[in-house]
Amino acid sequence: MSLLSDLINLNLSESTEKIIAEYIWVGGSGMDLRSKARTLPGPVDDPAKLPKWNYDGSSTDQAPGDDSEVILYPQAIFKDPFRRGNNILVICDVYTPAGEPLPTNKRYDAAKIFSHPDVVAEVPWYGIEQEYTLLQKDVNWPLGWPLGGYPGPQGPYYCGVGADKAYGRDIVDAHYKACVYAGINISGINGEVMPGQWEFQVGPSVGISAGDEVWAARYILERITELAGAVVSFDPKPIPGDWNGAGAHSNYSTKSMREEGGYEVIKKAIEKLGLRHKEHIAAYGKGNERRLTGRHETADINTFSWGVANRGSSVRVGRDTEKQGKGYFEDRRPASNMDPYVVTSMIAETTILWKP
């Protein structure tokens, strides 16, 4: 085993200029991450200098068997925390050979919104709170829970410490450090209300980079749980009953919101979000109706609400923002399995571009 470990950790730069690039994309379900690697002649730090690539789309539910080629367009580069050295992770989006974006390519439309001059001028910042649940591999049951049974009720687990409260911290901490190494703007982690559930935060990130960084962080988490023999679930309500669901609270501000008088801009933006509540809910993740019940720190899915420091509302404004008269707000509706490209661009579109 030590020889295998030695080989995995070989430093390629000692013998060659060549690097390994892991191309990553979103598969046909919209949540399944896929990747494959290729050798490149030397270090690359600009995605525009990376070659396009292709894969068998019929095996990812993205193309028919008789016309199966799908093209990968490199869009963002991160350092590879697994191979290290000059090796890289490459976030890609997917196109037909004719250059048309696939239906599962949510980045394409998001990039159009984020490149709109009105959006560019507002420099939208995002902070995404990605919740997830760690599961025991073969039984589809949360890490640390007794098989066929339940732990004690919620209360001691949120930000909890100790072997009877925190399950999977080694995975969480490994993921945290790997994301920092990769160059992802990860800003923190914490244990969540339901035992076996955790959260990491990405941001503040500007525009399209928020989506790139969340997908890269999800990929790294999938790889680490693979090594640990656990499974990560982004289901918004993995365990029915009196247990918290999993969300992806999305914190947001624009230049106008961050400047003097920004609180009035925030209130107008929230009003617009309320007018498009149904459209946002439809785009905020599958199965979200199981989570947004009005209980467990959620608002009811059918009703839009907002409030200061209210975690039972659709949108929450922080006390500091109210006090300072400027800042940001938190959209609490997105589910843990949301597509960050969809959510971030839709918030920008509604609050900046959409005219009621």
Swiss-Prot record:
UniProt catalytic activity: L-glutamate + NH4(+) + ATP = L-glutamine + ADP + phosphate + H(+)
Cell compartments where the protein resides: Cytoplasm
GO cellular component, one term: cytoplasm
Pfam families tied to this protein: Gln-synt_C, Gln-synt_N
Domain GS beta-grasp, chain residue ranges per copy: 19-99
Record keywords: ATP-binding, Cytoplasm, Ligase, Nitrogen fixation, Nucleotide-binding
ATP-binding found in the keyword field: yes
PROSITE patterns reported in the protein's UniProt record: GLNA_1 (PS00180), GLNA_ATP (PS00181), GS_BETA_GRASP (PS51986), GS_CATALYTIC (PS51987)
Tissue specificity note: Roots.
Residue intervals of the GS catalytic domain: 106-356
EC number: 6.3.1.2
Entry's Gene Ontology BP terms: glutamine biosynthetic process
GO MF, any single term: glutamine synthetase activity
InterPro entries in UniProt: Gln_synt_N, Gln_synt_N_sf, Gln_synth/guanido_kin_cat_dom, Gln_synth_cat_dom, Gln_synth_gly_rich_site, Gln_synth_N_conserv_site, Glutamine_Synthetase
Region annotation (Disordered) ranges: 37-66
SUBUNIT field: Homooctamer.
Family: Belongs to the glutamine synthetase family.
Additional observations: There are at least four isozymes of this enzyme in P.vulgaris. Irreversibly inhibited by the herbicide L-phosphinothricin (PPT).
Protein name (database record): Glutamine synthetase PR-2
